[in-house]
């Protein structure tokens, strides 16, 4: 019936259009049937309703994303050499970026945008932090680790696949050392002249938000001799950058005392004036209302909240959350002040986020000018056929 060496996923009639445009996902609603038995994560061929070969990918029976494409080349085998090629292609770009910007830390693999769906690898010095977020990525774990070791023979690898999305793939959470020594409790890295401490084992995501690197640098352009409020500060990257930019004072707000303690250390290890830095453990929504009621004012506010939306059913509620928190920030800014506001929610489009900021300004009774736009750093590329890869967006807004 077929010359395929792999089980075949047959698409429903008319559902091949996205694959012909080289989008890497096949949703469960587009599947007509499976031909042959495939285990979770196993390599399969994907064909149209007439049996025409379209792609080769990984099967995920537990997920709404029923398959993720590894390759659109029928002659390409999915083996250790495949993963080594993908890693080498990605490293070529990151090595150039690292030399250009003086980086020792970057995202080596950004999932679908680097041709490895469900795979995230962040590099912090000689430590590589691995996240395998799909059934296919987990199935190929040994091949991925082998490829990484071949490319970086002396590296240490730590697994941070402790992400809830794995449960949607029918996978258990995983965390721990894979290769080499255990990372220190706080690993020092460098970024645009800053020294920063990263908690690989217990920090958010892989330990640090590398995607905001360029936005942190851009902050310095707005803060000279200004009073700055840094909301959802985590370990203080924006605060350190603001101090390096010559701010008069910066207040960092987060609910985690552990993160604030690291933020304080980050200020100290950079030799910056600790008297200009304040660290407040509080809920940002509540604190902004308190500041508003007390008549507090700031010249620059950084608003970098966590993801508010995980799926489409949460989008409307997330819009209200973004609008509320940005309205409060706008109310706290002096005339001519600048709001640096971000969304890392992939379902939140740039246009929708901009509209939310505009609506927040109307509710605050203020006019705003959009003066600069931000996105994730260049080591987090967005492949043209997978626009969902652009998840981080932000604006610098001048508040009148």
UniProtKB/Swiss-Prot annotation:
GO CC annotations on file: cytoplasm
Gene Ontology molecular function terms on file: RNA binding; rRNA (cytosine) methyltransferase activity
Entry keywords, A to Z: Cytoplasm, Methyltransferase, RNA-binding, rRNA processing, S-adenosyl-L-methionine, Transferase
Subcellular location: Cytoplasm
Major location category of this protein: cytoplasm
Key word RNA-binding present: yes
Coiled coil ranges: none
Recorded superkingdom: Bacteria
Family the UniProt entry places it in: Belongs to the methyltransferase superfamily. RlmI family.
Name listed for the protein in its UniProt record: Ribosomal RNA large subunit methyltransferase I
Record organism: Klebsiella pneumoniae subsp. pneumoniae (strain ATCC 700721 / MGH 78578)
């Amino acid at each position: 019936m077929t010359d395929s060496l792999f089980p075949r996923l047959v698409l429903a009639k008319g559902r091949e259009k996205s694959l012909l445009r080289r989008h890497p996902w096949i949703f469960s609603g587009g599947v007509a049937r499976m031909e042959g038995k495939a285990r979770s994560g196993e390599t399969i061929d994907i064909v149209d309703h007439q049996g025409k070969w379209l792609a080769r990918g990984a099967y995920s029976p537990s997920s709404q994303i029923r398959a993720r494409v590894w390759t659109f080349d029928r002659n390409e085998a999915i083996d250790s050499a495949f993963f080594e090629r993908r890693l080498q292609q990605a490293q070529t770009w990151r090595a150039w970026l690292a030399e250009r910007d003086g980086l020792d830390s970057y995202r080596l693999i950004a999932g679908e945008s680097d041709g490895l769906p469900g795979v995230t690898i962040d590099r912090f010095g000689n430590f590589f932090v691995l996240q395998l977020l799909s059934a296919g990525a987990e199935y190929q774990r040994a091949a991925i680790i082998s490829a990484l070791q071949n490319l970086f023979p002396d590296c240490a690898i730590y697994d941070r696949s402790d992400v809830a999305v794995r449960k949607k793939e029918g996978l258990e959470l995983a965390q721990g050392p894979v290769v080499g020594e255990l990372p220190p409790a706080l690993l020092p890295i460098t970024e645009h002249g800053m020294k920063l401490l990263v908690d690989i084992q217990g920090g958010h995501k892989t330990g640090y938000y590398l995607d905001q690197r360029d936005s942190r640098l851009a902050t310095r352009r707005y803060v000279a001799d200004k009073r700055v409020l840094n909301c959802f500060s985590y370990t203080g990257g924006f605060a350190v950058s603001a101090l390096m930019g010559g701010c008069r004072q910066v207040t960092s707000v987060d609910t985690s005392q552990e993160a604030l303690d690291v933020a304080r250390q980050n200020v100290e290890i950079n030799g910056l004036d600790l008297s200009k830095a304040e660290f407040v453990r509080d809920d940002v929504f509540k604190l902004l209302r308190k500041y508003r009621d007390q008549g507090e004012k700031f010249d620059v506010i950084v608003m970098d909240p966590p993801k508010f939306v995980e799926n489409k059913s949460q989008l409307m509620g997330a819009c209200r959350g973004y609008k509320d928190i940005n309205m409060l920030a706008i109310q706290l800014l002096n005339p001519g002040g600048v709001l640096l506001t971000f969304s890392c929610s992939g379902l939140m489009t740039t246009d929708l986020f901009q509209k939310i900021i505009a609506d927040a300004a109307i509710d605050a009774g203020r006019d705003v000018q959009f003066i600069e736009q931000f996105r994730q750093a260049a080591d987090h590329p967005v492949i043209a056929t997978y626009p969902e890869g652009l998840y981080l967006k932000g604006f610098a807004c001048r508040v009148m």
